[in-house]
């Protein structure tokens, strides 16, 4: 059985790993997933990630980030735009997620970026997911 939404699979694996208090999580790699992980790392939601090759298949391993008292850095991570229903937004329509404590991750003509960076560049796009 083939997977229809690879990004949703990645987000679910990260969410489940945080709920299980795992240190690392791995999944098959792709360019869009790497771009999303770049944004998560830049915004401070994950420690780091590496891409490795096993049997001609690329895998990404993500080092999850926890606070000193063991709380997860990501409370919620949800897919917004799905293959069956794409969600696009102009930058003026994107209000701060959780009173600017969370972020939206957007796919724009200038690449994948957070809503904060999109506000600076004044560009909208497809809303991939929301993170808090």
From Swiss-Prot:
<dbReference type="InterPro" id="IPR000630">
    <property type="entry name" value="Ribosomal_uS8"/>
</dbReference>
<keyword id="KW-0689">Ribosomal protein</keyword>
<keyword id="KW-0699">rRNA-binding</keyword>
<comment type="function">
    <text>One of the primary rRNA binding proteins, it binds directly to 16S rRNA central domain where it helps coordinate assembly of the platform of the 30S subunit.</text>
</comment>
<protein>
    <recommendedName>
        <fullName>Small ribosomal subunit protein uS8</fullName>
    </recommendedName>
</protein>
<dbReference type="Pfam" id="PF00410">
    <property type="entry name" value="Ribosomal_S8"/>
</dbReference>
<keyword id="KW-0687">Ribonucleoprotein</keyword>
<dbReference type="GO" id="GO:0019843">
    <property type="term" value="F:rRNA binding"/>
</dbReference>
<comment type="similarity">
    <text>Belongs to the universal ribosomal protein uS8 family.</text>
</comment>
<dbReference type="GO" id="GO:0005840">
    <property type="term" value="C:ribosome"/>
</dbReference>
<dbReference type="GO" id="GO:0003735">
    <property type="term" value="F:structural constituent of ribosome"/>
</dbReference>
<dbReference type="GO" id="GO:1990904">
    <property type="term" value="C:ribonucleoprotein complex"/>
</dbReference>
<comment type="subunit">
    <text>Part of the 30S ribosomal subunit. Contacts proteins S5 and S12.</text>
</comment>
<keyword id="KW-0694">RNA-binding</keyword>
<dbReference type="InterPro" id="IPR047863">
    <property type="entry name" value="Ribosomal_uS8_CS"/>
</dbReference>
<dbReference type="InterPro" id="IPR035987">
    <property type="entry name" value="Ribosomal_uS8_sf"/>
</dbReference>
<dbReference type="GO" id="GO:0006412">
    <property type="term" value="P:translation"/>
</dbReference>
């Amino acid at each position: 059985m083939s997977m229809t939404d690879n990004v949703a699979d990645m987000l679910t694996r990260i969410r489940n790993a945080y709920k299980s208090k795992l240190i690392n999580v791995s999944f098959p790699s792709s360019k869009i997933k790497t771009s999303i992980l770049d944004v998560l790392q830049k915004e401070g939601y994950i420690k780091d990630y590496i891409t490795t090759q096993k049997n001609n298949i690329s895998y990404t391993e993500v080092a999850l980030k926890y606070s000193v008292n063991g709380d997860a850095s990501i409370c919620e991570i949800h897919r917004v735009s799905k293959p069956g229903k794409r969600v696009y937004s102009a930058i003026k329509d994107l209000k701060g997620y959780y009173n600017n404590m969370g972020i939206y991750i957007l796919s724009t003509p200038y690449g994948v970026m957070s809503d904060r960076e999109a506000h600076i560049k004044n560009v909208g796009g497809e809303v991939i997911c929301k993170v808090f």
